[in-house]
C-alpha cells in the first residue's frame, strides 16, 4: 500500500493536477484496498471494484501500442540511441564495459533469442544509460539498454530494463524454501504470480550485485497521471489499490485478512479523513527523502562539474 501510494503521489506531483488530488487518491486507495480485503472468500475471486472506464481505455491503448510508441514515450525518438537528460544519465566507463560484457554472455543471448524466435542470437547494444525511475532507482543500479536482436534489416529493437534486486522486506514463512540470491527470488516470484511478466525476466549479476533483466513491452508502460482528469486519477487509485488488496488477500487465511483489515482501520485518522495517518505520513516522508536525496545528488554533481571546469 505504501509503495503504491508513493508511486501515485510521485506521478501526481509531476502532473498538472492540484495537490489536493493526492490526498483524495490516498483516501480512495484505502477504500479500494479495504473492500477487496473484506470481500475475499477462500476459493473465489473475492469482491473487487469494477474497472473504471478510464482504466479499460488505457489498457486497450496499451495493448495496441507498437515499438515506436514505446520508443517515443521512453526515449523520445526511434533512432538507436537514448538521449540523456533528467530521466537518463551517462554511465561510467566501468558501467559501460560491464553491461556490454553481460550481453555478450551465452546465457543472455539464448534468453533473448527465445523471446524473439527467428532473429538468432546476435545481440547489439546500441546504447545504455542510467535510468532515473523514481524511488526505485535511488541508490540502486538501474539501467535502460537499447538492444538489437538479429542482423541488418532483420534486426529487432527492444528496450531492456536492468534493475538491482534488494533483500526482501517481508519475512518468509516458517519452513518455506527461498532462493538465497535476491535476483533469483524476484524472478521466481514473478513467474509464479505473473507468468506473462516473469517469463520475460532473467536473474544475473552486475558490478557484483544481483540484478533482474526484463524486456519491456509497449503495454508495460505505466499509467501516466497527466493523461487523466482529477476524477479519473482518483478512480484509478481506488481501482489499483483494489487489485493490490485482491492479490494480498489471496495469500492470507481468514484470520490474517481480519488482522490486516483491523490494522487498516485502526486509530490514527485525522480531520475526518479515512486514510490511516501512518499511510499518509509514510508516503509524505518517503517523497521528502527522495526529493532531498535527488537535490543533494544534483548539488554534488554541480560541485564536480565546477572542479572540472576550473582544472
Regions found by a protein language model. Name each.
Residues 1-63, 117-303:
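Conserved ATP-binding subdomain of kinase catalytic cores across diverse folds
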Residues 306:
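Extended, alpha-helix-rich binding/interface surfaces that flank or overlap catalytic cores
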Residues 311:
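Nucleotide/phosphate-binding catalytic cleft detector across ATP-hydrolyzing
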Residues 59-136, 146-148, 154:
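Acidic catalytic cores of enzymes that act on phosphate-bearing nucleotides/polynucleotides
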Amino acid at each position: 500500500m505504501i509503495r503504491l501510494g508513493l508511486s501515485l503521489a510521485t506521478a501526481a506531483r509531476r502532473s498538472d493536477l492540484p495537490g489536493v488530488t493526492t490526498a483524495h487518491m490516498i483516501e480512495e486507495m484505502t477504500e479500494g484496498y479495504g473492500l477487496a480485503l473484506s470481500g475475499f472468500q477462500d476459493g473465489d475471486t473475492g469482491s473487487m471494484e469494477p474497472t473504471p472506464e478510464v482504466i479499460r481505455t488505457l489498457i486497450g491503448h496499451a495493448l495496441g501500442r507498437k515499438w515506436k510508441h514505446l520508443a517515443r514515450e521512453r526515449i523520445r525518438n526511434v533512432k538507436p540511441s537514448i538521449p540523456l537528460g533528467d530521466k537518463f544519465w551517462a554511465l561510467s566507463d566501468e558501467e559501460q564495459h560491464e553491461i556490454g560484457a553481460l550481453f555478450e554472455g551465452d546465457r543472455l543471448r539464448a534468453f533473448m533469442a527465445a523471446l524473439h524466435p527467428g532473429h538468432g542470437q546476435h545481440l547489439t547494444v546500441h546504447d545504455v544509460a542510467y535510468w532515473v525511475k523514481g524511488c526505485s532507482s535511488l541508490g540502486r543500479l538501474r539501467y535502460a539498454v537499447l538492444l538489437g536482436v538479429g542482423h541488418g534489416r532483420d534486426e529487432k529493437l527492444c528496450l531492456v530494463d536492468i534493475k538491482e534486486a534488494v533483500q526482501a522486506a517481508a519475512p518468509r514463512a516458517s519452513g518455506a524454501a527461498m532462493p538465497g540470491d535476491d535476483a533469483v527470488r524476484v524472478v521466481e516470484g514473478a513467474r509464479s504470480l505473473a507468468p506473462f511478466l516473469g517469463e520475460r525476466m532473467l536473474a544475473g549479476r552486475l558490478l557484483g550485485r544481483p540484478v533482474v533483466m526484463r524486456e519491456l513491452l509497449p503495454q508495460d508502460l505505466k499509467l501516466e497521471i497527466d493523461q487523466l482528469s482529477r476524477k479519473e486519477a482518483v478512480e484509478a487509485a481506488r481501482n489499483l489499490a483494489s487489485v493490490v488488496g485482491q492479490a494480498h488477500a489471496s495469500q492470507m487465511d481468514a484470520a490474517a485478512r481480519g488482522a490486516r483489515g483491523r490494522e487498516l482501520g485502526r486509530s490514527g485518522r485525522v480531520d475526518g479523513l479515512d486514510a490511516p495517518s501512518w499511510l499518509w505520513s509514510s508516503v509524505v516522508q518517503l517523497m521528502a527523502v527522495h526529493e532531498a536525496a535527488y537535490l543533494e545528488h544534483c548539488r554534488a554533481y554541480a560541485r564536480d562539474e565546477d572542479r572540472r571546469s576550473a582544472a
